UniProtKB/Swiss-Prot annotation:
Gene: lipB
Any one Gene Ontology molecular-function term assigned to this protein's record: lipoyl(octanoyl) transferase activity
Keywords attached to this entry: Acyltransferase, Cytoplasm, Transferase
Protein name: Octanoyltransferase
BP term (GO), one: protein modification process
Amino acid sequence: MQNTTLHIRHLGQQDYESVWHAMQHYTDTRNNDSPDELWIVEHPPVFTQGQAGKSEHILNPGDIPVIQVDRGGQVTYHGPGQLVVYPLLDIKRSKIGVRQLVTYIEQSIIDMLAKYTINAYAKADAPGVYVDERKVASLGLRIRKGCSFHGLALNVDMDLAPFRRINPCGYAGLEMVQCRELGGPQTVIEAGDQLIITLSQLLGYQHLVHHQGLAAS
């Protein structure tokens, strides 16, 4: 049965590992009655290497830490000025397939950017969202016990230079772009507020409940 309520957790800026472990804990301990949640966060500079990641795609990390994680995909960069959204959803309960969830996430970003007259699109062979062949958003999910965690990263107003220290998502020379350059949302808060609307609508949630910070464990 579809759960029509989505809980939104606004986490502010939090270090990557603590949020990652909190996602794992929430997913491992949830049951059939646990609410679906969307976590909105920014991370300090960090490279994360997905399960398909190859070390040769990390060219010159320098002083930015590299963390091996349990999501799909290859290496990406997180940093201040980037909107990170983690959908912690019981997709088995909602009867949403993994591919369908990826499509919904990509489409929510496309729909949000369309409000700013930005023509963004997805690619069948390279998950994420693009504008004029430049990547504005990256995706990497994990499904455990029929529930999703990890999620999406949307470049809003950030230093894109660290992306040049890696082959983003395993693609050498892939050019990144951000919302500020495109005339899109200018802040992470603005982008998050808009993306919550488009994503919750596509996923079929009718009620949104907002929280500051993580629930006490």
